Amino acid sequence: MENVSKKSFSMLTDRPGKALLLFAFPLILGNLFQQFYNIMDSVVVGKFVSENALASVGASYAVTNVFIAVAIGGGMGSSVIISQFLGAGRLTKMKTAVSTTLISFLVISAALGAFGLAFNDRILSLMNVPDNIFADAALYLRIYFWGLPFLFMYNVQASVFNSLGDSRTPLKLLIFSSLLNIVLDLLFVIEFHMAVRGVAVATLIAQGLSAALSFLILMRKLRGYRQDEEDFRFYDREMAASMTRVALPSILQQSIVQLGILLVQSVVNTFGSSVIAGYSAGTRIESISIVPMLAIGNAMSTFTAQNMGAGNQKRVKEGYRVCYFALAGFAVVLCVLTQLFGSLFISAFLDAEASAEA
């Protein structure tokens, strides 16, 4: 119990700069693995199937990102409430918040998955997906919607771990899931010749196992926190409403950006599969580039919530200054790297001729 408390409350006792950067580092690695996890589908189909296969996965990517944004935004919002209870030492309330979060997002993800399955083809039609890649794009997206609860539960549980001051467990799970996804991608595509279906099924299996392991580890971790005088509840409606108020701005922030990208993707789709493939490769590189900024922002969110819960407003201001300069430094470095080595990065997804077009 002592070890659990130490790790959980490091955000309250360590120097703000040290606490934030040490907490953010596993988040950066974890987010990189998350992007690597997603990118492998594109790399495998682009290199071992065809340009059209890459285009079909890329055309679906903008849609999947909207749902990922909802999961991440919701998890970030809920983690604020969890961190506040943890910072205030109200551990039973913290457990109730975790349980309420998991139940809420399991129901939401199932509903969104059902919606996606019902309107799968209609969504792609509205996005102007070309006929020559429509069938594969619809297949990839359909399998993705079946696995939506797995994706939601992993991302939300990762946010819960972060809110508890544990950014290492999500990283370990992502490494496991990413490696499994790569092996299954190559197995299903190269050995079983399943093409687009293969990478979609591989992703579903890897996400499912990752979500299940995450749940088991989280339950074990929560048992390490002592019970206090407050009553535990599996689901608290008032707390769910409070979480919704906090999470909604985060969900909207994440989703509006992705909806904008979705509209751009709809325009790109009118130019044919070659342009879609090039654009898909470019957006994957962009996703990697913004990882450090997102991770530091998430670290600051957890840092702020825990310290506000404990009444340490001065530490929050100090942490903000550290984040500001760290983000500015990352932005300059990443801008230079993408400008200098953009063509090299694109070649990871496409052959030489297609890379030149991209």
Name each model feature, range by range.
Residues 54-114, 151-170, 278-342, 346:
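Small-residue-rich hydrophobic transmembrane alpha-helices
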Residues 131-154, 287, 293, 354-358:
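Alpha-helical transmembrane segments of multi-pass membrane proteins
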Residues 18-79, 83, 248-268:
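Signature of the first transmembrane helix
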